[in-house]
A protein has these predicted regions:
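Glycine-rich phosphate-binding loop used to anchor ATP phosphates in small-molecule kinases
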Residues: 51-102
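P-loop (Walker A) phosphate-binding loop of NTP-binding proteins
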Residues: 8
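Switch/connector loops and helix/strand junctions flanking conserved nucleotide-binding motifs
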Residues: 106-113
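Hydrophobic anchor at the beta1->P-loop junction of P-loop NTPases
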Residues: 5
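Walker A/P-loop
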Residues: 14
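ATP-binding Walker
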Residues: 11
């Protein structure tokens, strides 16, 4: 099974993924952003790597290849519904996928980004693109919903494990 944690920047995807790995140490973590950064090194004029079909296809290939006999958790923001469906459909054609849509208030998102232990350029980029994310995940097509305001990553991970039948 693949558990895809999606949602706006600052919602806690990485922290929740880490909490899931704490609860399920045999699971694997996949960060599709790494492939995107690599692609941007060879195609610097691309802008956003999510616009590259090679990245979206690679996301699917990496996720399916890593799934094998263990569960995989993927913390990755994909707000464009067409890209999301392309990736999700590609994975679902091969393996069970449970998309989880994490949300939080704008105030919470901005506070978390400000507190996050990332380089200032990363925080600035996230804040610059946050407005485009706010409201983008209101569509139920993005998967099961969990609000993260006032919840710890461990609590959210526990909720996810119950939702997907892995508690």
């Amino acid at each position: 099974m693949i558990v895809w944690l999606n949602g706006p920047f600052g919602v806690g995807k990485t922290a929740v993924a880490e909490a899931l790995l704490d609860a399920k140490p045999d699971w694997l973590l996949l960060d599709p952003e790494e492939r995107g950064v690599e692609l941007l090194r060879t195609t610097p004029d691309a802008g956003d790597f999510q616009d590259l079909p090679a990245w979206r296809a690679g996301f699917v290939e990496d996720a399916v290849a890593r799934n094998g006999s263990v569960d995989v958790v993927i913390p990755m923001t994909v707000r464009r519904l067409d890209y999301y469906r392309e990736i999700l459909d590609g994975m679902k054609s091969v393996v069970e996928v449970r998309p989880i849509r994490l949300t939080a208030s704008e105030t919470t998102l901005r506070e978390r980004i400000a507190r996050d232990d990332t380089p200032p350029t990363t925080a600035a980029w996230r804040l610059q693109h946050l407005d485009a994310c706010i409201g983008a995940f209101d569509d139920a097509a993005f998967g099961d919903h969990i609000g993260t305001d006032g919840r710890t990553p461990a609590k959210i991970a526990a909720l996810i494990l119950v939702m997907i039948g892995r508690a």
